[in-house]
Each structure stands twice: as C-alpha cells, then as structure tokens.
C-alpha cells in the first residue's frame, strides 16, 4: 500500500485531471505530484474518456513521460494560448504565492503558468506554509559566469545563497537552459514575495527565480482524514 504522502498526491492528481475537458491545450507541470497527474491523464486518453488534448511540458522529464504515455505534445512557441496549466509546488503560502524549482525547472514552469488561462496547483498538505522560505530554499537560476557575482548581491539583500550541487554527477546542477542554480535562504523567510521577486530578477546575471507571485487560481490540497486520502479545494479570492 502506498504511504500516506503518496496517497495524498494521488488524490489531488486525480482531482486535477477531472478539470480537463476535451480539446484543451494543457500545461503539464514537473515534480512527483505532476507526474502522477500526467499518468492519470495518459490513462484517460488511452481509454477514450478524453480526446484531442495537447500538452505543453515544463521539463524534459515531463516531455519523456508524456510521450511514452501517448499524450500529443507541442512546444510553448507553437501554441497561442494554454487553457489550463497544472503543476505542483514546493511551498504555498496563505496568499497563494509559491516557491517552485526543487527540480530546477522553474523557468519553463513560470512561462507556462503565466501563459495559462487558469493555473491550478496540486500539493499534499505538507506543502502549505504560513510563510515562504522558512522550510524550503528559494531557487535562483543564474548564468554560469555570473553565479559568484549574484551570490554576493543576494547577500546584500539578506540572503545566504549556495550553489546547488548535483547528486548523481560531479559538479553543479545544470538546468535545461544550461544555467546554474543558487539556493537561497532569506533571514526570517520571505515577507513580501512580490517585492523580492522583482529585486532578484533585476540582478544582472539572473534568468529567473522560483517565486510564483499572483499566478495561482486554485490550489488542490491532498490530506488524510480518518485514514482516507481526500482533497481540499482552495480558490483565490479576487
């Protein structure tokens, strides 16, 4: 039997797929929960429950998985719009601001989320926090030749930034865009995500950071009640 966290992820993945309609262009996110959603989508396409779906992936890993499941794919530059994007998150605060980028895919993830008419985030209950960056580091993608300079500038903003090192190869993590990632801890967490997102992105050498501000329309939260996995729906108030 799957552990409780996996059960929560499976529940929200299934709930997210229920929002998909025939003919949609979908943003297919990255990470473990999004992977379960892609698997569930593939099963519905194979059974004929869904038809004429086109996916836009946010990572090479997601592209490989979707292709193996027979999900038709297009590049982001080949679509005029995205009806619905579904993705996971590393942290979600009460204002629906996110930290993403644990898998170093946040640049493409943010491009897809910002293009979508609706952006739905799927997480288990462990990802809901009162304040961002107290438990998860903020990823910042930087040009390879600029990481030392950016590291120093982030320190001026009150952050401690470490170069992310790879687990299965020697040297640092290299993103799909060929860049490096700094993982940042801000003293006391992030109180104003919108301001910090702008400040970091204005630093020379920074491509993008993992703060997703004012993009999320709905959060589906997997939770366990009386030993049974269920889903809580949180919708942003305009």
UniProtKB/Swiss-Prot annotation:
It catalyses: aldehydo-D-ribose 5-phosphate = D-ribulose 5-phosphate. Pathway: Carbohydrate degradation; pentose phosphate pathway; D-ribose 5-phosphate from D-ribulose 5-phosphate (non-oxidative stage): step 1/1. Its EC number is 5.3.1.6. Pfam families: Rib_5-P_isom_A (PF06026). One of its GO terms (biological process) is pentose-phosphate shunt, non-oxidative branch. GO terms for cellular component: cytosol. GO terms for molecular function: ribose-5-phosphate isomerase activity. InterPro entries: NagB/RpiA_transferase-like, Ribose5P_isomerase_typA_subgr, Ribose5P_isomerase_type_A. Substrate binds at residues 30-33, 87-90, 100-103, 127. PANTHER family: RIBOSE-5-PHOSPHATE ISOMERASE (PTHR11934:SF0). Catalyzes the reversible conversion of ribose-5-phosphate to ribulose 5-phosphate. Homodimer. Belongs to the ribose 5-phosphate isomerase family. This is Ribose-5-phosphate isomerase A. It comes from Prochlorococcus marinus (strain MIT 9303).
């Amino acid at each position: 039997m799957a552990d409780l966290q996996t059960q929560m992820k499976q529940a929200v993945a299934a709930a997210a797929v229920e929002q998909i309609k025939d003919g949609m262009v979908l943003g297919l996110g990255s990470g473990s929960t999004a992977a379960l959603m892609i698997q569930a989508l593939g099963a519905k396409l194979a059974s004929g429950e869904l038809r004429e779906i086109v996916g836009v992936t946010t990572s090479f890993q997601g592209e490989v998985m979707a292709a193996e499941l027979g999900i038709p794919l297009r590049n982001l530059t080949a679509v005029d719009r995205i009806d619905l994007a579904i993705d996971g998150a590393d942290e979600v605060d009460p204002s629906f601001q996110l930290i993403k980028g644990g898998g170093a895919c946040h640049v493409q993830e943010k491009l897809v989320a910002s293009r979508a008419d609706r952006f739905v985030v799927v997480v288990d209950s462990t990802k809901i926090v009162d304040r961002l960056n107290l438990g998860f580091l903020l990823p910042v993608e930087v040009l390879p030749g600029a990481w030392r300079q950016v590291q120093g500038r982030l320190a001026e903003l009150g952050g401690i930034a470490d170069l992310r090192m790879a687990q299965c190869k020697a040297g640092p993590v290299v993103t799909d865009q060929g860049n490096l990632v700094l993982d940042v801890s801000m003293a006391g967490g992030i109180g104003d995500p919108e301001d910090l997102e702008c400040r970091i992105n204005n630093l020379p050498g920074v491509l993008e950071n993992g703060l997703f501000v004012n993009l999320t329309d709905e959060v589906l939260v997997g939770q366990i009640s009386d030993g049974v996995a269920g889903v809580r729906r949180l919708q942003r108030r305009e």
